[in-house]
């Protein structure tokens, strides 16, 4: 199944983090990929401590999209493509032997919803994936192919504002988080532990 959390409201990443913790608590694997988040977000500190969770993120700081040079855009595109390829490799490793290279966590295999192949439960989070897709900072063919070939044993969560039509069409769950009020309207900056 595919989940999409979009909109201008706060909480899209928080929803994805909650789902990741729930899956890890149930003994499943989690691949949590974060795109276009500049500063270290505090949620990654706890996710990295969970042995069932693999966190993938571009570690280099590129700044805001409108401040990136053409060289920066080319570099971050390559790094985003590497993350997508690594996600595919991790899913294949988990499907084939019940563990990923990085984590070595055994989980009980279970039948997928169609009963075709036995494989462990996997949750893949593509946090803020809408931005690189909309701004051509990722090979969209990789993303589209991944959506089409998502194994039945996996759940996929996508977050970000302004999702593309194919993301909406592919989703089984779609929630649009709408901002009604936010402290930044009063000049209050983002606070650690709350917004990041």
Task: List each model region and its residues.
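Structural recognition of the conserved hydrophobic beta-strand(s) that form the central parallel beta-sheet
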Residues: 126, 155-160
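Residue-level preference for the first positions of well-ordered beta-strands
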Residues: 1-4, 29, 121-123, 155
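Phosphate-binding/switch loop-helix module in NTP-utilizing enzymes
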Residues: 68-152
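Conserved nucleotide-binding/hydrolysis micro-motifs of P-loop NTPases
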Residues: 37-39, 61-62, 130-131, 162-165, ...
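Structural signal for conserved beta-strand scaffold positions within catalytic alpha/beta enzyme cores
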Residues: 55-57, 158, 175-176
């Amino acid at each position: 199944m595919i989940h999409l959390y979009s909109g201008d409201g706060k909480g899209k990443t928080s929803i994805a983090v909650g789902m990741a913790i729930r899956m890890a608590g149930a003994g499943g694997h989690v691949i949590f990929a974060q795109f276009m988040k500049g500063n270290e977000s505090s949620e990654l500190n706890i996710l990295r401590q969970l042995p069932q969770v693999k966190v993938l993120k571009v570690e280099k700081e590129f700044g805001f999209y409108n401040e990136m040079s053409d060289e920066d855009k080319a570099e971050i595109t390559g790094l985003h493509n590497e993350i997508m390829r690594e996600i595919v490799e991790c899913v294949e490793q988990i499907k084939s032997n019940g563990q990923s290279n990085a984590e070595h966590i055994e989980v009980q295999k279970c039948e997928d919803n169609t009963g075709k192949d036995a494989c462990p439960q996997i949750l893949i989070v593509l946090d803020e994936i809408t931005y690189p897709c909309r701004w051509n900072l990722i090979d969209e063919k990789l993303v589209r192919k991944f959506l089409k070939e998502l194994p039945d044993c996996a759940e996929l969560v996508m977050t970000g504002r302004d999702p593309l039509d194919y993301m909406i069409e592919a989703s089984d769950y779609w929630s649009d988080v709408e901002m009604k009020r936010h402290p930044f309207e009063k000049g209050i900056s983002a606070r650690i532990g709350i917004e990041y």
